[in-house]
Structure formats: C-alpha cells, structure tokens
Curated annotation (Swiss-Prot):
GO cellular component: plasma membrane
Cited PANTHER family: UPF0756 MEMBRANE PROTEIN YEAL
InterPro entries cross-referenced by the UniProt entry: UPF0756_TM
Main localization (coarse): membrane
Name of the molecule in the record: UPF0756 membrane protein NTHI1233
Membrane-topology annotation of the record: Multi-pass membrane protein
Keywords: Cell membrane, Membrane, Transmembrane, Transmembrane helix
Transmembrane feature ranges: 1-21, 52-72, 81-101, 123-143
HAMAP family according to UniProt: UPF0756 (MF_01874)
Family per record: Belongs to the UPF0756 family.
Length: 150
C-alpha cells in the first residue's frame, strides 16, 4: 500500500490536528476516518458517504435530540408551558434555525469549497471561543443568506 500525498490528504491531516488541538472529537474522528478511507481500499466507498452522509448524520442527530424525551429525562410541558412567550420564542427560533440549515445544505452541495471555510471557522470557534461544533449546516444557511442565495 502506498500513501497518496495530495492536497486533500494534507487538508485532512490539518483538520485532524486542529480537531485534536481543539478537543473536537467530531472533527478528529471525521478527518481520521476519511483519511483512512482515502488512503486504503475503502476509497471506493467515499461516493456513498458523499451521497448519504449528511442525511444519515441528520437522522442520527435527530435520534440523539429525541432520546431524552423518549427516556423520560425531558418531560413535555403542560398546556400553560406551551402557551408561554418563552415557548413561542423557542419554537420560532427552532423554525428559523431549521430553515437556515435547510438552505445551507444546497449551498454546500453547489459550492463545496465553502465547506472548508465553514469547518475552519467552526474549529476556531470551538478552540478559541468555547463554542460547540454543531453549526456547519446552520453556518452554511447563514452564509447562503449573506450571499443572497435565499
């Protein structure tokens, strides 16, 4: 087996290092898996990840978000809780964020080079600003809004 030293491999190594330095396991694991896939016989499966990866990731994320409700750790509020201004605002923010993320996915497909910038920005936000790495889709939606794609 020979290593393929190219710009994508270098980018994945940089993302791997940044993921480790920023204690971002999602970036670290993702970069490591993709680097291993790129450098081995598994490279033939990368198109499957490209086609279904975001959809599978959203499904897993949704399962993770709904799990505390199913396990009973989070209770549904009573009717008065649903009618409060805080609940109305949280629903509105949830709708806005879901809409933005929905607009970000096509932008990421149309201009995949922007994904690199979004990931670097996410890593910087996690490493230096105490952020949490859940924002690339929403960041892409905000970018689409700023670029006039919406």
């Amino acid at each position: 087996m020979t290593l393929q030293l190219n710009t994508i491999a270098l980018l994945l190594v940089i993302l791997l290092i940044l993921g480790v330095l920023s204690n971002n396991s999602a970036i670290t694991i993702s970069a490591a898996v993709l680097l291993i896939m790129q450098q081995t016989f598994l490279s033939s499966h990368i198109p499957l990840l490209e086609k279904y990866g975001v959809k599978i990731g959203i499904i897993i994320l949704t399962i993770g978000v709904l799990s505390p409700l199913v396990s009973g750790k989070i209770q549904l509020p009573d009717l008065s809780g649903f009618l409060s201004w805080k609940m109305a605002l949280s629903i509105a923010v949830g709708v806005l964020v879901a809409w933005l993320a929905g607009k970000g996915v096509p932008l990421m497909g149309e201009q995949p080079i922007l994904v690199t910038g979004l990931l670097i920005g996410t890593i910087i936000g996690v490493a230096f600003l105490g952020g949490i790495p859940v924002g690339p889709l929403i960041a892409a939606g905000i970018l689409a809004l700023l670029l006039g794609k919406i």
